Structures are given as C-alpha cells and as structure tokens.
Curated annotation (Swiss-Prot):
Keywords for this protein: Cell membrane, Membrane, Transmembrane, Transmembrane helix, Transport
Similarity comment text for this entry: Belongs to the multidrug resistance efflux pump SepA family.
Membrane-topology annotation of the record: Multi-pass membrane protein
Top-level taxonomic group: Bacteria
Gene: sepA
Protein name: Multidrug resistance efflux pump SepA
Amino acid sequence: MNYLKHKFYNLLTTIIVLFIFVLSGAIFLTFLGFGLYGLSRILIYFRLGDFTYNRSMYDNLLYYGSYIIFGYFIVFAVEHLMDYFRKMLPENAYFRGATFHLISYMVATTLFYFIIHLNYVYINIDFWVIMVIIGFLYVCKLQFYPESKNLNNRK
C-alpha cells in the first residue's frame, strides 16, 4: 500500500510539472505569434516585406512557423559553432571582442538568407531588412544574455 502511495505522489508531481511546462510553452508561443504578427504588419505597412502565402490557418501556421523554426535553428547552430571555435582557438584575434560578434552576426545572417529565406518564395523581404532584424535580435541577446562565467565550475 505504501508503494502505491509513493507511485501516486510521483505521478501527481509529474503531471503538475508537465502542466506547468505545457502552459508556459503555450504562453510563450502565443506571445511569439503576436510579436511576429506585429512585425509582419509593420513590414507590410512600411512596404519592407510582402507575405503572399494565404491558405488555411493551419497551412499558414505550418509555412510561416517552419520559416521561423528553421531560421532559429540556423542562428542557434552558428552561435554554438562560433563559440566552439572561440574555445578551441582562444589566441586567434578573430575570435575576440567585437570582431567575433561581427563575424557571428554576418555568418548567421548570410546563412539564414541563402539557406532558409530564398527557399520560401511567398515571403519577400530584402536582405538589408533581414540584416536589421537579425542584428536587433543579436544585440538584444548580447544585452539580456551576456557572456558570463560558468558558475557550476568549482576549482
């Protein structure tokens, strides 16, 4: 009987944690969706972008969502690869300071444009607009998630 009590407690704890995870993920995706909808409206208003894919809600969600997910994957992969290079080559001048951030930003933007953006024919945004958007996001990442020491390393 005691075994069943602990099993129920573990199951209840798992369900609560899963509920919190799903709820926070849903809230994040909702805010992301509203933010991207607002960004697309701003780009359309200033004639900086054109979004001509207009099917059903789920088709639009899949098309534009995959654009965002693939773009995020490219930027994420470039950042981690550049961090890996910086750790492997600490004396190299290209992997220090502003030069490192400029190279990371340019590589991520260029790869995003040629690998992701050119394959989505219904999204028409100029390269310089993509550079400004990714540059703004990169500066926000540097501001809100600065490089810091690994606090888990104990000497």
